[in-house]
Amino acid sequence: MKLPTLTFAAVLAIVALAAPHAQEAAARIEALHFHHVHLNSTDPKAAAAYYPKPFALSAAATTFNGFEAVKTGNVYILFTKVATTPQNELTGPQTSVWHFGWNTPNSRKYDENFRAMGLTIAQMWDAADGKLVDLSSDTLPGLPTQEQILEMRAKGTQPTLQGGFGYLRGPDGAMIENAQSGTTERFNHVHMYHEHPECAMQWYTEHLGARRPAGRGGVAAPAATGDCHTKTYAPPTWPSFAKTGFVRDPAGSVNFDDISISIRPWPGGGLVSTRGKIYDHWALSTADLEVTVTRLKREGVKFLEEIHPWGNSRAAMIEGPDRIAIELVEVK
């Protein structure tokens, strides 16, 4: 039996159908850019004045679109005045936003400066049976489990005291990371909790055009195949804000421009809406809000707020995985 010959056009069609779904999604999504993090504050002006203290090279207090603000690089931190101190992870149920933060060229020197300025450090436990420390490099290396900590102690292993990450406790209880990387101080990430990190990454990619970080050789990291729901979480490791340790994996991240939406798992789910809490939402900008809103509605994305005036522009609000509120602002 003679098999039919495929035409060149048919071959091209097959290749096109076989292209990764994430690449197709990115190609059809209009450009969205990271715009701001929006906090609730009892004193927005004082809150905005805080950030240039720890991050003097990259943060400046200003106003934007009617809000007290911090300008850092190409993004803003905005503040809305509220009557009572907003809930954070210490005073209320956990939301999907864990913290946001800066890359710094020397996290230990920055930490020393923070203490000299009298800023509050959010310390971490270095082990289940250990002590509170400022930086991850004050702990035994490698983000170890308690079993690994005991093994390293027996071998005489010591903390490196080089680089690492630590945290400030800022105005209204906001947590702000100081993470050594590169040679330039810059705002670089929002750190999220998601029950199913892979599902969240797929959602950000498919609906918002986020990019997965490049792997080895600069090649885009491929999306995982099959069921994205997490079946097994890694054991807890240290340092940790909880003495019982912190579940760090499976983790992940996506990028909007050079801002990372970094993800740690939240086993068991139950994260509450970010609205009204310390980190109310974060925002992306679009050149054509009507186009973006129409597409997202067609894709079945949940809307919290329809298109409305936003200062001298317009905005809308959607809800993403684990009840993260994401504002869409129009920037022509």
Model-derived features: where do they sit?
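Positively charged n-region of N-terminal signal peptides that target proteins for export
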Residues: 1-6
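Short, surface-exposed ligand-recognition loops at beta-strand->loop->(often short) alpha-helix junctions
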Residues: 38-43, 102-105, 192-198, 284-287
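Conserved catalytic-core motifs of GNAT/GCN5-like acyltransferases
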Residues: 58-65, 211-220
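Amphipathic alpha-helical segments
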Residues: 42-58, 110-117, 196-212, 296-299
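Short, structured motif recognition centered on aromatic/hydrophobic residues
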Residues: 34-39, 77-79, 97, 176-178, ...
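Vicinal oxygen chelate
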Residues: 21-29, 112-192, 214-255, 262-265, ...
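Bacterial N-terminal signal peptides
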Residues: 7-18
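Mature N-terminal segment immediately following signal peptide/propeptide cleavage
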Residues: 27-63, 68-69
